């Protein structure tokens, strides 16, 4: 009973957080600014995505991540980092397509969810990308395939564990494999120059190291810089 009450308490608190984020996002969007969320837990940006989906029906999401995050719940928690995109795709009809890149830790039910989505979820699994590279495909070609799957208006959701584990050793769930920093930069540059418009973004799951270890924060800050640049470049501001 205590466990069920605790789960219900956390789920209710999570919904309040989403409401707070949505309200803050509304104020930012009303000013004409580009909204961004810096998590914590990858569930953090749900409120922002919800607000954007109301204003930009038909939008797409580019998810860079080690995990699919398509579980219907995780140990009873409906709003955990493992369920963010299940919640997005089942609750937000304004999101036309989810394009996942770098996925390499995924459950059978998540694969079934992708297969049942009728193309609404497009997953570029990390190993499949590498297999194509080993067969001779360039990273530019792969990036263009990824971007081609996105609609005109794009939200970028970046979980730091989408990178190789040496770049984010303190994140909560690092996974072998992943994208190199220059590969991410190239993907974001091509996205910005593709004619698509970045309408917002998030960066989540960056975890600090020891007080004298700035590596994780340094990598996270550089990713944030690139995300902001991608959004501005897509709008011809820079």
Task: For every predicted segment, state its role.
Residues 1-238:
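Conserved alpha-helical scaffold segments that buttress catalytic/binding sites
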């Amino acid at each position: 009973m205590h466990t069920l009450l605790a789960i219900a308490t956390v789920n209710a608190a999570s919904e309040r957080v989403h409401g707070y984020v949505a309200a803050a996002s509304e104020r930012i969007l009303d000013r004409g600014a580009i909204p961004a969320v810096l998590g914590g837990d990858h569930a953090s940006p749900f409120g922002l995505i919800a607000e954007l989906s109301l204003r930009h029906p038909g939008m797409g999401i580019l998810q860079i991540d080690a995990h699919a995050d398509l579980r219907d719940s995780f140990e009873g928690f409906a709003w955990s980092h493992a369920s963010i995109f299940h919640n997005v795709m089942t609750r937000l009809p304004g999101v036309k397509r989810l394009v996942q890149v770098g996925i390499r830790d995924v459950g059978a039910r998540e694969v079934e969810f992708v297969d049942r989505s009728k193309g609404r979820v497009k997953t570029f699994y990390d190993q499949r990308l590498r297999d194509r590279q080993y067969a001779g495909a360039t990273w530019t070609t792969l990036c263009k395939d990824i971007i081609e799957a996105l609609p005109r208006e794009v939200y970028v959701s970046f979980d730091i564990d989408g990178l190789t584990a040496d770049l984010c050793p303190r994140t909560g769930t690092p996974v072998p494999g992943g994208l190199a920093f220059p590969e991410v930069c190239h993907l974001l540059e091509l996205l910005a120059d593709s004619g698509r418009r970045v309408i917002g973004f998030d960066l989540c799951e960056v975890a600090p190291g020891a007080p004298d270890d700035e590596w994780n924060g340094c990598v996270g800050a550089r990713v944030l810089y690139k995300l902001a640049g991608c959004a501005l470049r897509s709008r011809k501001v820079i």
